[in-house]
Structures are given as C-alpha cells and as structure tokens.
Amino acid sequence: MVRAGAVGTHLPTSSLDIFGDLRKMNKRQLYYQVLNFAMIVSSALMIWKGLIVLTGSESPIVVVLSGSMEPAFHRGDLLFLTNFREDPIRAGEIVVFKVEGRDIPIVHRVIKVHEKDNGDIKFLTKGDNNEVDDRGLYKEGQNWLEKKDVVGRARGFLPYVGMVTIIMNDYPKFKYALVAVMGAYVLLKRES
C-alpha cells in the first residue's frame, strides 16, 4: 500500500493548480473559454425566459420546500407550472401562490372557491398535511386569495430532483463551492 506523500510517490499537482493552468493559456484560449462560459449562462437564461412565455408563469419550475403537501408532493419534488389567465381556478387544484410580506411562494391545494356574478374569484387553500387552512399564512386581514396571487398551477413533477436546491440553500458554502467548480471546469476545459 502506498501512502500519499510517501517517499518515491508522485502526486500530480497540475490538475489541482487552477491558476497555473490559467497562466499557461494564451489570450485566445482564455477568451474562448470565457466566451464559452458566457454562452452557457446566456443560453440558460434564454431557456428560462422561453419557459416563462410558454407557460404564462413567472416561475415555471419550483421546488417543494416543506412537507405540507405530503403525500401528494414531498420535500424536494420539482413542480412544473402553468398559469394561463383564462383557465378557471377549481377546488382540488394544486396552486403555487405568493403572499404579501413573504418572499417564498407556497404550494397548497385549493379547498374552496367563491365566484361572484361579475366573474371575480376568491379562493381558500390548505396544505394536504396541515390541520387547518392557510388563513394564518395570508397577510393580516386577508381571508381569501385572488387570481392575481397565483404564480402557477402544478401540471407535473419530478420526485426529489429539487433536493439539490434545498441543500444549496441550507448550506450556502456548498452552493459557492459548486458554482466555483463548475466555473473552473468550463474555463479550464480544453478542446481535444
């Protein structure tokens, strides 16, 4: 068995020396790698904006952050949303909504809908795993949600795929390390 650092062993340090690799690149290679990285980022942004237009939702993909919707959805499930204004809101539907004063949208089921003669709709939500409805989550004095509060309606999901997002939010250093590693990979990757 050979131990790291033992006499006569050689550990390759060139793969670990990121700045040394950057210094070895000529300006054209470095420019190409930075441009490649910028194209990846801009492509991701264009895909996101395209999804916003196609789905009608300001946030077409969301992650379930709590267990309040179990057994329908679990913490870490990735939800795909649509939000077409002409679609009526129905009891039993799962919606993602924003509440004034809260930064993070909430994923819950519509349990009651009240429609007025003029077409205005008000509705009440509740998490499947919660004992009481969501009136305690709404802003003070608000008893019902309106269509303007809806970010989207759940149309599909991928189980547990969003756990990466939860881990990155729970452990911010992991998020920065992951971004740094991906950025270094893109910058240092050389065409064969």
UniProtKB/Swiss-Prot annotation:
GO terms for biological process: signal peptide processing. GO terms for cellular component: endoplasmic reticulum membrane; signal peptidase complex. The keyword Transmembrane applies. It comes from the Eukaryota. Catalytic component of the signal peptidase complex (SPC) which catalyzes the cleavage of N-terminal signal sequences from nascent proteins as they are translocated into the lumen of the endoplasmic reticulum. Specifically cleaves N-terminal signal peptides that contain a hydrophobic alpha-helix (h-region) shorter than 18-20 amino acids. Component of the signal peptidase complex paralog C (SPC-C) composed of a catalytic subunit SEC11C and three accessory subunits SPCS1, SPCS2 and SPCS3. Within the complex, interacts with SPCS2 and SPCS3. The complex induces a local thinning of the ER membrane which is used to measure the length of the signal peptide (SP) h-region of protein substrates. This ensures the selectivity of the complex towards h-regions shorter than 18-20 amino acids. This is Signal peptidase complex catalytic subunit SEC11C. It comes from Rattus norvegicus.
